[in-house]
Amino acid sequence: MFLFRVFRSSRTAIILLLCFLVSPCLQAQSPSHYEPSLESLDKHPLPQWYADAKLGIFIHWGLYSVPGWAPLIHPEHDFTSPDYITHNPYAEWYLNSMRLEGAPTKAYHREHYGADYDYYNFAPVFNREIQKWNPDTWAKIFHDAGAKYVVLTTKHHDGFTLWPSLTPNPKLAAERQHATRDLVGELTAAVGKQGLRMGLYYSGGYDWTFVPGPIRVPADYEAVKPQSEAYGKYADAHMRELIERYHPAVLWNDIDYPKSGHPLQIMAEYYNTVPDGVIDDRFGVKHSDFISPEYVTLDKISPTKWEECRGLGRSFGYNRAEGEAETIAPADLIYLLVDIVSKNGNLLLDVGPEADGTIPPVQMDRLLALGAWLQMNGDAIYGTRPWKRAAGETAEGIPVRFTEKDSAVYATLLGQPKTTGITLKSLSLKVGSQIYLLGQATPLSWSQQGDAIKVSLPATLPGRYANVLKVIGPLS
């Protein structure tokens, strides 16, 4: 993944500004044909499936999964830190990190593989390991976790592709260019059988086989973007292959797109091939269907659809150094999803498999917890829209997040009540309205007390992490 370029102090303000600049017209009818112009592309409406989905699974898998290591120095992704690049916690940046003097990854590589061991020697190892992989197993796991779509890295910054591309890489030996199995095609088929949609990530802005770098300082982020005519044609050809062969529901580019390429043409061809597809905001042009903050949650409801991408841990790619302490806790993961959805967002939650496709046990634990919670409480998530405000609080100090769907408002408690009653502050409800607890069929007793609603709860609550009140009636 890209190191998100907006410093933490100003990220949210810039992201919210982008909401207005890139907002697609949600009421517009889909044109029968798109042209490679912003005027035409901006007529693309946000598909209802994407607005309803709320949860996707991101997968970072490639040569970097073989060493599968990054340092754990920066727990909060402090991109402004002077040593962030040399101590990059993203394991998928292994190739860059192993070439930096003073980088822990360089020392790790020297110790485990030798100083002269070429990164692309991992290709035959990866291709041997992927023979153990079962795409149907992944698809079932993602379905049971509650995801509605999946996004796979088809080519990351190292240039290695997860499909047998018909466009050869002039910088790499044939046996080191791509996976020997069509991982993209196989997972697309498996995901479809589970009723999920398949999206594809492509690193258009970086390809370290064309411009190796390395990236040592922030100024290098732009300098290492390949802009040659040859690379523009190469990226365009890859994009066309992915669109024509796999019809991805999400076209997820990263790090901008080469100026020598034709992003507007690619977008038009994509919409004409997949009319209900969506495009992210990382092509470097002023069109997208959603914005994509990385490890950042917006502070308020956004008028534009947005999708937070983040790993279950600090890395997107597999990092064998990560464990419980570096992995988001089940409760925090559920609270994060609820918070994002209340503000008109989706969560694109990343898993980092080992080279053979094994999902680390600590990540499996989180997926199972999330899936179990969604099985009971999914009505408050899927197909909902933000209510008139995202956040509230009980008189007892429990944070609340609101969503709505049809005639119901859902109030999700981000914490466990310590008594058999809670008071929802600054809310009023008309007599005759009903309040239910998701997971139970009997309505709850409630009363209006001034500008607050007091709700009686059962002694035993059905939810382990976050319980949801379903309010049927005019809530204000």
Residue ranges and their predicted role:
Residues 8-9, 24, 407:
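Generic signature of intrinsically disordered, low-complexity, basic-rich segments
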Residues 29-476:
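Mature catalytic domains of secreted/periplasmic carbohydrate-active enzymes
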Residues 6, 15-16, 49:
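Generic alpha-helix initiation/capping and coil-helix boundary signal
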Residues 12-13, 297:
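Intrinsically disordered, low-complexity peptide-like regions
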Residues 13-24:
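Bacterial N-terminal signal peptides
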Residues 1-9:
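N-terminal secretory signal peptides that target proteins for export/translocation
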